[in-house]
Amino acid sequence: AERIRCGGMGLGGVLTKTGLGTIVEKGKQMIEVNGQQYLLETALRADVALTHSRRADPIGNLTFRGSTGRADHPLIATCADLSIVECDHFCDLGEISPETVEVPGMFIDMILV
C-alpha cells in the first residue's frame, strides 16, 4: 500500500527496514540514514485503475462502503493514469456532502453506472 500511496503522491518511494537481510533485498537500493540501513521500495503507478464506490457524482466525487473501500480504493484511484470507477448509485451534483467525499473528482476520469 505504501508503494501505491507514493505513486499517487508523486514520491519516488518509501524507505523500510522490512526485508533487510532476506532475499527481498536482492537487487534493491540500500540507503543509509543517520547510520541506519534501509531498503528503497520504489513507487508503484498504474496505467489503468478500476475501482468500485458506493456513490459517485457527475464530477467524480466518491464515497465508499466498509473499511476496505476506504483503505484501498482512494490509493488506487490516485496512482493511475486512467482511473475508472463503477458506482452503486450515481448522485446529482451536490447530493454528496463535501465532508463525506473520500476521493475527490480530480482523480477520477470515467464513471460507470
Model-derived regions, located:
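Conserved alpha/beta enzyme-core scaffold
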Residues: 1-113
